[in-house]
């Protein structure tokens, strides 16, 4: 029974990292994932392979699962895994190799492992630079106050920027690093202005980027 599972916790080390990842991720999307993880922690089952997961963070997983259900978000193993881990940069790098995560999951975990974000003033700006999936995941992890912003990003697609390096060069900037710098300046101003498409507004933002 449970005692036998606890006694054989170290046997997990004999399993392949892929097997450990697959089993953990399968558990994380179960309806009672937080309860199951809490039981595993109480038995010391996870300690040999994932000592970073501690009982104090199980409540984060429970809250996230409740939020997913309330907001209509599908359970996601990587997002739920992030809820169990200490918030620090480089989570994907740290756990990607240990659990043989895919490049995509490693990048997602890196993004979600950053310190808890504040509620963004403009969720679309956050989504533009981090991607809609990451922005919505971070809002789910943030708490109930992120619901309106999360809803605003439903179906959101990253708009194409109306200016390219060619436009910068056509304005007299010598090809090279300066073009990229000016283009980045334009991009920041354009996104902050709500990604306008009209020629007058775009032209004014381009003028400002070249000033």
Predicted segments with their positions:
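Conserved, hydrophobic alpha-helical core segments of structured domains
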Residues: 3-148
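Residue-level recognition of alpha-helical structural elements
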Residues: 1, 124-125, 175, 198
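Charged substrate- and nucleic-acid-binding regions of tRNA-handling and nucleotidyl-transfer enzymes
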Residues: 58, 135-211
